[in-house]
Amino acid sequence: MSGLSIFQRLRWRAKILLQGKLKSLSAALPLIQGKQGLEIGGPSELFQEDESGLPIYERVESLDNCDVFRETVWATHKNSYAFSEHRAAGKNIFCDASALSLIPDQSYDFVLSCHNLEHLANPVKALKEWKRVTRTNGGLILVLPHYRRTFDHRRRPTSVKHMMEDYESNMGEDDLSHFPEILELHDLSMDLPAGSRKEFRERTLKNLSNRCMHHHVFDERNSRELLSRAGIEVLAVECADPCHIFLISRFLP
């Protein structure tokens, strides 16, 4: 979302008003209504009351947030996590999304994740960590960018086999194996904050300290398959403008 211009954001919000709430909202509400959750990489405009077809922030009982750094490209965090003016602030937890060592088992009823799984070198490891900190049959509301509608449109969706191999080899977040592909195929005309080709290259080489890189690329098919292979039941999949794949799901015991 950070690559959208002001015009694109206004156009997107106008479309939200026209398209209304997502059909999958009915599947999401039982997972989060009046429950305690953890967000990964929040806050997200997509979950706010006036900003999307999936307004869930004001329906939760409580919400904490996990981010890798106190200050990122997208947000600067305090110790408290103010996600809604109508709900008490939660707390910010600073650790890697695939290594939630600061969080005990079964601490939450659900996990929210919006546009950050693509930034992880080992998404299966992350999903399994999210399951660990979630209570039995806990919910997962996952939003991913549809590659065809983003600066990744020249790339191909990453195979689930590849992502499973990353998990089996315990791939670390310092991985740059996708660097040549990204440098060649990234559409900088759709990612103005990335700067020039040289600036983009330098930023990507420093990915461990900024986490801007999209390691993997998703569409409806491989995102659903990835969750299934990771032991997660997919309840609904829905695409929405300008570039979102919403996956409403539940962690299986």
Protein language model regions, located:
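Membrane-proximal basic amphipathic "stem/tether" segments
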Residues: M1-L31
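Short alpha-helical segments and helix-capping/turn motifs at coil-helix boundaries
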Residues: G20-S26, L46-E51, K125-A126
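A short, aliphatic-rich alpha-helical micro-motif
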Residues: L31-I32, D105, L127
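Class I SAM-dependent methyltransferase SAM/SAH-binding core
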Residues: K35-L100
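S-adenosyl-L-methionine-dependent methyltransferase catalytic module, highlighting the catalytic core
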Residues: F83-F94, V124-K131, G139-P253
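Hydrophobic beta-strand segment of the Class I
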Residues: V111-L112
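Hydrophobic adenine-recognition pocket in adenosine-nucleotide-binding enzymes
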Residues: N116-H119, L144-H146
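Helix-to-beta-strand junctions that scaffold the AdoMet/dcAdoMet cofactor pocket
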Residues: L120-A121, T134-T136
